[in-house]
Amino acid sequence: MQLEVILPLVAYLVVVFGISVYAMRKRSTGTFLNEYFLGSRSMGGIVLAMTLTATYISASSFIGGPGAAYKYGLGWVLLAMIQLPAVWLSLGILGKKFAILARRYNAVTLNDMLFARYQSRLLVWLASLSLLVAFVGAMTVQFIGGARLLETAAGIPYETGLLIFGISIALYTAFGGFRASVLNDTMQGLVMLIGTVVLLIGVVHAAGGLSNAVQTLQTIDPQLVTPQGADDILSPAFMTSFWVLVCFGVIGLPHTAVRCISYKDSKAVHRGIIIGTIVVAILMFGMHLAGALGRAVIPDLTVPDLVIPTLMVKVLPPFAAGIFLAAPMAAIMSTINAQLLQSSATIIKDLYLNIRPDQMQNETRLKRMSAVITLVLGALLLLAAWKPPEMIIWLNLLAFGGLEAVFLWPLVLGLYWERANAKGALSAMIVGGVLYAVLATLNIQYLGFHPIVPSLLLSLLAFLVGNRFGTSVPQATVLTTDK
C-alpha cells in the first residue's frame, strides 16, 4: 500500500463525514421526510448545479468513459460531448413545473409525483420495483469503480477497497440524508473540477505535448485519431443511441429528477442551468481526453477501466495522486449517495407507508428505518460487486436505459399533457421496461440502434394507445401524496 496516496484520501473521507455530522444536526430543524429526503427544498443555484452534475457524473464518466476513450480513441471524446445539454434538459424540461407541482402535492419522492398525477397505486408499485431493480445494477457499478480506484492508485486489494468504500458511503448517506448528500456533492464537484484539469495537464506533459500524443496514438492504431474510432464503433446509429441514452433520456432518471423538486427558487434553477452546463463540459471533455491521450503514455493496459487511476499514479507525484484520487472518488460517492437515498425513500415513502399510513407521524421509527435500510442496501451492493466485469460502462448504461424506458414518458407527458392518464402511463412503463429488458438481454440491436431507442419509441406508442382506454385524472387539489 502507498501511504502517500492513502493519507490525503483519509483526510478527504474525514471531511465527508464532518459534513454528514453537520447535516445530521441541521436535520432537527425540519420535518423528517422533507428534511431527510429533500433537505427542506432549500438548495441555491451553485449547490443545485453541483449536486445535479455530481449525481449525473459517476463511475461511468470518471472510470468507464475514459476507459472507452482509451480503447476507442479521440472519437469517443467527441461522443462524450453529446452529453453537454444534460443539465439544461433536466432543469429546463422538468425544473420549474416539477418543483411547483411537488410543492402543491407535498411530494417527497418521484413516485409521489406520479401518484398525485395519475392516482394509481399499481403504477406506484410498478415504478418502485423498477427503480429498485435498476438501482441495484447502477449502484453496483459505482461500488466496483470505487474499489478499482483504491486497488490501482493506492495498492489496496480489490476486496479490501470495496469494503472501505462501501462501508464509508453507506454510513454517511444513512445518517446525513439529502442535506449531507448535496453539501458533499458541492464539495465533491469542486474536487472533480480541480482534479480533472490537473490530471489532463499531467497526461499531456507526460505524453510530450498534445501533438506528440496524437502522433503516438496514430502509430498505435490510425483509427484512434478518426471520428469513427477504433473498430469503426462510432456509427450514426450508435451515436444517436448514445445521445438518447445519456442526454435526452436523463430526464427520466429518478435520482436526477428528484433534484428538480428540491431547489429554493427560480433564480436557483436559472443559475443551476448555466453553472451545471459549464461544469459538465469541463469534466466530460477533460476526463475523456485524458483517457484517450493516456494510451500514448501507457499503451499496454489490458483492463481499460484502470486508465485513470493508473495515469494518476504515473503522471502525478504520490501525494498529489492521493489528493486527486478524491476527484473520481467524489464522482462515484456523489452518485451512490443519491441513488441510495432514492432507494431508501422508495422503500419507506412509496412502499412501507403505503401499507402502513398510520406510521406517517412516527418520526423516530422512520429515522431508524431509513438508516437501517440504507445500511442493508449497502451490504447487498458489496456482495453484488464482489466479482466485477472487465468494463463497467456497459453495465451502467444497461441500468440507466432500464430506468429511462420505464420513467421517461410517464414523467414528461404527465407534466405537459393534461389528458394523460394512468392506463397510458402503465402501458408505457410495461412496454418500455419489458421490451428494453428483452432487447438488452438478448443483445438485439435493430438497424444498429441501442435497445433504448426502439424501447422509448414503442413505449411512447403504448402510452398513446393505452391512454385511449383510460379516463383523464383531475389535477390533485389536496396537498398530500399519501398513497
UniProtKB/Swiss-Prot annotation:
One of its GO terms (molecular function) is symporter activity. It catalyses: (R)-pantothenate(in) + Na(+)(in) = (R)-pantothenate(out) + Na(+)(out). Pantothenate uptake is not reduced in osmotically shocked cells or by ATP depletion with arsenate, but is reduced greater than 90% by the dissipation of the membrane electrochemical gradient with 2,4-dinitrophenol. Residues 24-42, 95-123, 179-189, 254-272, 327-368, 413-423, 467-483 are cytoplasmic. Keywords: Cell inner membrane, Cell membrane, Ion transport, Membrane, Sodium, Sodium transport, Symport, Transmembrane, Transmembrane helix, Transport. InterPro entries: Na/Glc_symporter_sf (IPR038377), Na/pantothenate_symporter (IPR011849), Na/solute_symporter (IPR001734), Na/solute_symporter_CS (IPR018212), Sodium:Solute_Symporter (IPR050277). The chain crosses the membrane at residues 3-23, 43-63, 74-94, 124-144, 158-178, 190-210, 233-253, 273-293, 306-326, 369-389, 392-412, 424-444, 446-466. Residues 1-2, 64-73, 145-157, 211-232, 294-305, 390-391, 445 are periplasmic. It is found in: Cell inner membrane. GO terms for biological process: pantothenate transmembrane transport; sodium ion export across plasma membrane. It holds the Pfam family SSF. GO terms for cellular component: plasma membrane. It is a multi-pass membrane protein. PROSITE patterns: NA_SOLUT_SYMP_1 (PS00456), NA_SOLUT_SYMP_2 (PS00457), NA_SOLUT_SYMP_3 (PS50283). Belongs to the sodium:solute symporter (SSF) (TC 2.A.21) family. Catalyzes the sodium-dependent uptake of extracellular pantothenate. This is Sodium/pantothenate symporter. The lineage of its organism: Bacteria, Pseudomonadati, Pseudomonadota, Gammaproteobacteria, Enterobacterales. The gene is panF.
